[in-house]
Structure formats: structure tokens, C-alpha cells
A protein has these predicted regions:
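Ankyrin repeat boundary/linker residues
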Residues: 48, 81, 114, 147-148, ...
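Ankyrin repeat A-helix N-terminal signature
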Residues: 23-27, 57-63, 90-96, 123-129, ...
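Ankyrin repeat structural motif
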Residues: 30-37, 63-71, 96-104, 129-137, ...
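Hydrophobic h-region of N-terminal signal peptides that target proteins for export
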Residues: 8-16
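N-terminal segments that cap or nucleate solenoid repeat domains
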Residues: 17-57
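Leucine-rich solenoid repeat scaffolds
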Residues: 452-501
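Start-of-repeat signature of ankyrin repeats
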Residues: 51, 84, 117, 150-151, ...
Length: 510
């Protein structure tokens, strides 16, 4: 038995008048109910404790015959229970077209709202029952009325449920294509944490619901009716950003083809290009990567965006929410203010994205607010195990790093450039992770084997775990004696650290 719209008070021991008929239908004693109706021995409108009438219970049970008998006996098709539910809203919830038609023919109000302002049309809109929606609309259901809690219309409900055909029916009956839901104006709380404060949620459009769900048919239906493809929510998230963020790359491609702004960023400064690069190598919270089912891949979106004029040098405006953890605690300090798509790609040793970005004018060593550059990041510098989730131990990581470094160096990246708060060089990062192949590759290209960071540490110190900690499961994983011996054999020496008044703040590691 469905109970979404019927109050849980039905089991209460109190009764409002003679509710024998309602009790019989609710408890499944159908024969007894039919007998009471036939003999007129019970009031067909007598409700039980929560105001639920026999007709509402019959609609809830999908009992077409009982619904017809009750109406012929004088049941009120518009009588509500304490939650504002009517027989019509219950039939809509059950997606029962026949009962919807019977009730409407008997005078049921197609616009009767529940306690939260939700109408039968909104309820039907979440289903695939276009026929029931058409019955309601033909009887005068208001297609643009909003429910009270979130200010959402039937079109938004349909979009959030990926009901393309339903949306087309609603749009054909005049649904406002760009209507916005309410904005949740919560009282802001002062936070001492160094992280961005989100904008008030809400102001969602049917387009934003559709792109969030990845419903191509829904998006196409809206575009055909003239929906604005760049209308954002209060956080600046546009339909294109929403589609990419939620891994709906076919939808993203369609929006780009329809003229979506490829350079519009959100509250945090994330452009569509940044998010596409981000998703191309995004680990999902320690679990295996979950590839999209779309034909279009993230790297395809990167290419399409660049071909459409996306600016590869747009920088983040603030530290964005961290996608791979349950809460934004600003874990990854490298991908912060000033980070470019190229730096994001370099951090992941994503040679394919790096090549595309460089070919389209990315500035090779544009630093972020921490002074970190793509060339230094590509060698593993600036990251710790906490924000790579084991990614830096993949079997092909060193080959990826070498390919990425070669691209960056060929476009002007500095082999001995020092970056970040600790002024680290590419060789420091490779030594820190114990990447022997990368160390040898950098040295063969002429990397300064004894270059020191701002504290006086050399690559030998990084390899031996003296220049910063890294641990997993409480065990240190930052001592790579083989790497240290390799560097020493080639002339490397340990540095003489300068006196530090305090260790620089931020994650441990390079």
C-alpha cells in the first residue's frame, strides 16, 4: 500500500464520525465495503482519524470499481485529508490514468494542492504517464503553478525525473521554459575554516535539472522551446558546467553545439574546460574510477571546448569543493586560487590534455597563488598521498610523468625552475616519490642534481625522507633508499638545511 500522500495517523485509535466504510477499504475488506455502499449503511464521506475518506482509500488501492461505486453513491471527489491529499492526487501518485479520468469527470479539481502546494500535475510529471498529464491539462491544470517548499513547477519535477516526453507535453501546454525555483535563503554562519562559503542553493531551472540528470531528450526539448543555455544558479553553475561536473559528456557536447558559453566560470572560477580536464583523470574518493557511459569522453570535451575558443589560461578564483571526499576541508592545497587547466592536467600527468592545452595557447608555467607551476607539478612536486589517493603508485605513473614533462619542457617549461611555497624543482618531486625513471630522465636532460629548495634540502634529502613526511595507514612511505643511492652515485649530496623558525603551513610533503 502506498502511503506517501496519506497520513500515518490512519492507525490512530480515534475516529471522526462513523468511519466504518473507510476502515473496511483501508483494511482490504472489499466485499464488506461494497455491501455497505449498496445498502447505504455507511456514510461514503465519513473520514477516519487523519481525514482520509473511503474514496481516497479506494484511489490509493487502485480500485477502479470501488472508486466508481463511491462516486455514484455521492462521494466527494475533492475532500482532503489532513495532509491536503485528495483522491485525484492519490490516483496521480499511482499513475492510474483510468481513475484520474473518472475523478475528473466527477468534478475533481485538477489544481487542488496538497499541504506543500504540490498539485496532481506535479505528481504525475514525475512519472512517464503522459496520458494522465494530458487529462489534467485538458481539464485546466495550471502548468506553471509552483509548490510551496522549493518553488518548483511540474516541468522541473519532470526534468528532475528525466521524463522527456512528459516535458514535451507540458511545454506544449505553455510551461515556462526558463522558470526558476525558489532560492533557499539560509542564515549564513561565520566559519573560521579557510574555505569558500557556498552561495544560497536554489534558483534551479528545468534545464539545470535536466543537465544534472543527463537527460538528453529533456535538454533537447527545452532547447527546441528556446530555453537559455547559459542561465546559471546562484553559484554560477551553468547547464554546461552542470553537465560536465556530473559526467554527462554527450549532453555537454550538445550544449556546446547549441552555443553555450565555453568561457563562463562558476563561483569558484571553474570553467567548463577546467572541469573537463579535471574529470579526465578524476579518482572517485578512493574507489575505482567510474567511467561515464556516454560516447563522448572528457578528453573529447577538452578538445571541443578549445576548438570553440575556450581560454586555457582561466584561473580558479578560490579553492573549490573537493570532489573526492565527503566534506570540503581544503585537502588539496595545490589546486587552489590561480590554478589553470594546465596545472590540473600536469598534477595528474595527463599528457593528452597537456598537449591539447599547449597547442591552444596555454601558458606553460603560469603559477597558482602558492607559486606552483605545471612543470614542477608534473614531476610529483607539491602533492602528498592524502590528495592523490594512491594514484601516484600506478604502474604507468612514471611513463606518464616523463611524457608530460617532455611536453612542458618542449614548450618552455623550466627544468630547474623552482616553484611553490618551498621553492621546489621537478627533481625534488621525482625523488620524493621514488620515481627512479623520472629522476634519471631529468638528470639526463641536465637537471641540477644538487639544487636546493628554500630550506636547503636537495634531491637526496627528498629521496631519503628528510625533506617532508608522507604516510599511509600510519606507516611512513617517504623513504626511498634506492632512489637516494641512485642520485648519490651520480654526484648528488645531502643539503645543509637552513634554520627554520617554523615549518611552513600546509600538507606535509614536497
Amino acid at each position: 500500500m502506498k502511503t506517501l500522500l496519506i497520513a500515518a495517523l490512519a492507525a490512530a485509535p480515534l475516529f471522526a464520525g462513523n468511519a466504518e466504510l473507510a476502515d473496511a477499504i483501508q483494511s482490504g475488506r472489499r466485499a464488506a465495503a461494497i455491501e455497505m455502499i449498496a445498502k447505504k449503511s455507511a456514510d461514503v464521506n465519513a473520514a477516519d482519524a487523519d481525514g482520509t475518506t473511503p474514496l481516497l482509500w479506494a484511489a490509493n488501492a487502485n480500485d477502479t470499481d470501488l472508486v466508481s461505486r463511491l462516486l455514484k453513491a455521492g462521494a466527494n471527489p475533492n475532500q482532503r485529508n489532513l495532509l491536503g491529499s485528495t483522491p485525484l492526487s492519490e490516483a496521480a501518485l499511482n499513475s492510474n490514468t483510468e481513475i484520474v479520468q473518472i475523478l475528473l469527470s466527477a468534478g475533481a479539481d485538477p489544481n487542488a494542492p496538497g499541504a506543500d502546494g504540490q498539485t496532481p500535475l506535479m505528481v504525475v510529471a514525475r512519472t512517464a504517464n503522459v496520458a494522465a498529464a494530458k487529462l489534467l491539462l485538458d481539464k485546466g491544470a495550471n502548468v506553471n503553478v509552483k509548490e510551496a517548499q522549493r518553488g518548483q513547477t511540474a516541468l522541473m519535477w519532470a526534468a528532475a525525473s528525466s521524463q522527456g516526453p512528459m516535458m514535451r507535453e507540458l511545454l506544449a501546454h505553455g510551461a515556462e521554459v526558463d522558470a526558476k525555483s525558489a532560492t533557499d535563503m539560509m542564515t549564513p554562519l561565520i566559519s573560521k575554516e579557510p574555505r569558500s562559503q557556498p552561495r544560497p542553493p536554489g534558483a534551479m531551472t528545468a534545464m539545470l535539472f535536466s543537465t544534472r540528470e543527463g537527460c538528453m531528450d529533456c535538454v533537447q526539448a527545452l532547447v527546441e522551446k528556446g530555453a537559455k543555455v547559459d542561465l546559471p544558479d546562484p553559484e554560477g553553475i551553468t547547464p554546461l558546467i552542470s553537465a560536465i561536473f556530473n559526467a554527462h559528456f554527450d549532453v555537454a557536447k550538445f550544449l556546446i553545439e547549441k552555443g553555450a558559453n565555453v568561457n563562463r566560470w562558476d563561483w569558484w572560477g571553474r570553467s567548463p574546460l577546467y572541469l573537463a580536464v579535471d574529470y579526465n583523470t578524476l579518482p572517485h574518493g578512493g574507489r575505482p574510477d567510474q567511467p561515464s557511459i556516454d560516447e563522448t569522453l572528457p578528453i573529447d570535451i577538452v578538445r571541443i571546448l578549445l576548438e570553440k575558443g575556450a581560454n586555457p589560461n582561466l584561473q580558479l578564483k578560490m579553492l573549490p569543493p573537493y570532489r573526492a571526499t565527503g566534506a570540503d576541508r581544503g585537502v588539496d592545497q595545490m589546486l587552489t586560487v590561480g590554478t589553470t587547466p594546465l596545472l590540473r592536467a600536469a598534477k595528474a600527468q595527463d599528457a593528452a590534455a597537456i598537449q591539447l592545452l599547449l597547442e591552444h595557447g596555454a601558458i606553460v608555467d603560469l603559477p597558482n597563488s602558492q607559486g606552483m607551476t605545471p612543470t614542477v607539478a608534473a614531476a610529483g612536486t607539491g602533492s602528498v598521498d592524502a590528495d592523490t589517493r594512491g594514484y601516484y603508485y600506478a604502474a604507468d605513473i612514471q611513463d606518464r610523468a616523463i611524457a608530460s614533462l617532455d611536453l612542458l619542457l618542449a614548450h618552455g617549461g623550466e627544468l630547474n625552475g623552482r616553484a611553490g611555497r618551498l621553492e621546489q624543482a621537478p627533481l625534488h618531486g621525482a625523488a620524493f616519490w621514488g620515481w627512479n625513471k623520472v629522476v634519471e630522465h631529468l638528470l639526463a636532460k641536465g637537471a641540477d642534481i644538487n639544487l636546493k629548495d628554500s630550506r636547503g634540502f636537495t634531491a637526496v634529502d627528498y629521496a631519503m625522507g628528510r625533506a617532508g613526511g608522507n604516510s599511509r595507514g600510519g606507516q611512513r612511505i617517504d623513504v626511498h633508499k634506492e632512489t637516494g643511492d641512485l642520485i648519490i652515485a651520480k654526484g648528488g649530496i645531502a643539503g645543509t638545511p637552513v634554520q627554520q623558525s617554523a615549518r611552513p603551513r600546509g600538507p606535509a610533503g614536497p
